[in-house]
């Protein structure tokens, strides 16, 4: 039998610890002991007769319509969201368009919770999820729940700029953990925490780690199972809460084999789930992981529905925060998404995720092949990623032909970037992702295979190669 | 010619002043001086081919279908959101489902800005709007933009509990301004600010006022034009930023005439707009008003789309906050809403708002008539509201038959509430809305005419009258 999670309430921020429930939310559940329908004149909920959307429909791909050899190939199905329904497994507009609980509509929440159980099955009792208005909001809520102004937070040495922009205005110092090509180093994390000197850092020892373990942004690296276990053990040793930010989790891939093509692996849903790298959540016996899931990379960014999974303490405090920060995710989104998920079912959704996995594998292979073909090998180096949507590559600074100009790394990167844009290719500069600019001594660029058309990859990389050849001894 | 707004940057919080734009957002706009299409390998935007929603449709009421005497009476129209479109006035799914600007999709934003101009026409140059994930998020963003932990904020003596729950965990002291039946008192505001003693209050003089000017929650009161002008002048005198929270603005009504019916006034859109009480925004020559608008009461709470209107400084800082707090409103919501608004046009939307106005007037009249009929006049007193969805009424404490028990106001209200629920009617207790419990010496209840069916009003109020008669000398 699974154990109870640890009491980790000492991690709550002043803001979070002081949150209270609105009396109006609680009172909506009032019941009479008599057999009588309660007429509510309590909460200011508009009568659904004033909702001007009376039905919604969406065209979605039929299950396996994405497979060329399927009898459903190319087929679209229509799913409907009716105004009202007496079926308990329908989320009607009269509910979806109304004020809802901060945790999201029950039916969609149940679907996402069951999905989370299938994939991660957290090893303690009482875990739950809260739906949010997306991963961005998850992070804002989690940071405000756990940190006070003046705290420090552990992050990967290169990290997602918007996450850093969420942290710094809250008064947090971002402490970079060293990385190699396979993600961040447990030894570096242990070293920082073991030798923390609150006086010289000007803040108490960090108690929160923010990480993108799979297909990390920007480096594309994925932490191995062994590292994950070491890191979790370190989190226990140093009493750290792990914010596991996993938008790219389902974009896991087979190893790159040097070809601009990919096999559409005919594996079962069970095999697909089994091959996914174990998450921190799946090994979280203490309840010290807050996992943030997103639909942005696997359904659509515009859905603005994400969720976080955690132990009851963080769920309850997170719910109080969500109620006053965002109220709830869009009911229009939730209505359409639930209709789609219900139509597909858990298995149909896993089929879709396999399709996404295959599509990104193909895209990665195309982009890597273009890089292998066009980039000058004498100055560019990179590791083929096995997850995510990014390839991170170093450009050898020692071969820069204008070294006499004494430019900084950001200056060189900006100059190369401007020339690349002028030649018709946009990409991201390494310095945008550097947590501590004082220790930035290598030139990096990040390219993504998520967006451009496949036939554009060669053109884009050839253009960039030309820019490099003008600036580096190749 | 309208003037420039004042420089009010000294009002920004530490958090807000330190926000920076993500470099990735800026670089998406990179352009080449050559006549060349830029292939972007920069931002991690999924290719729209992976968005599983290929088209959305919604059934919405045809313009004036809500009028019994219209040729469109009862008619529904279908509006569609296609996957892609070359029309510049269509918001397609390929855009709506993608990552967007924090300010919202341009077309919907333009519609709401034009609507704001028609209604309020702010009297300075450069005002703008940002779409948010709803009014709740507007308030969270505004509070974090303007206040630091330890600050005080002016609020109405009775106020919206969720707003107070947004403020207090941020470390704000809520300073109640005295009210009468017509809203809060300018003299009380001036008195507090003129005599502010930072030492005894333990915080600097407030520089932010939070108010619900129209159909205030919970009191239903509406500030007169004269009071609004006085308050704006006081805001200038004491250098106050006004957070104008206006979810009930369009629920303005003619005076109650003692009848459970209402005339569906055949007035033009121009007359409708002209009769709306002037907002603080409409008199904001300095740019010191942040107006928060909501679709929750006039379209649907589940839309989770709101917007705030302010001068450029607050728009730019608010955008930086929205990007890291919520990213943007749901694109699925925005797609459906824009299709509806485009179909209706500005004039059609005003027709809809007149319908909402009429419907709420009818509901208010029904509920007031039920109250006039059933509530014991010797203990209950109330003022018919001219806006909003709430009626606030006092129950004379001096007639409480258990006065010897020495119960507090909240204890009496809770007891009455529990008995009411047991009898099958739910309503809200006055003490839930009290900002300073130390000065709570009157019994109040709040009822809403927004939700229940018209034929339930009599039953509900009769039940509550019975509870009062058991507890008060009537």
Curated annotation (Swiss-Prot), chains A, B:
One of its GO terms (cellular component) is nucleus. Keywords: Aminotransferase, Cytoplasm, Pyridoxal phosphate, Transferase. One of its GO terms (biological process) is aromatic amino acid family catabolic process. Its main location: cytoplasm. GO terms for molecular function: 2-aminoadipate transaminase activity; aromatic-amino-acid transaminase activity; pyridoxal phosphate binding. It catalyses: an aromatic L-alpha-amino acid + 2-oxoglutarate = an aromatic oxo-acid + L-glutamate. Belongs to the class-I pyridoxal-phosphate-dependent aminotransferase family. PANTHER family: AMINOTRANSFERASE, AROMATIC_AMINOADIPATE AMINOTRANSFERASE 1. This is Aromatic amino acid aminotransferase C56E4.03. The lineage of its organism: Eukaryota, Fungi, Dikarya, Ascomycota, Taphrinomycotina.
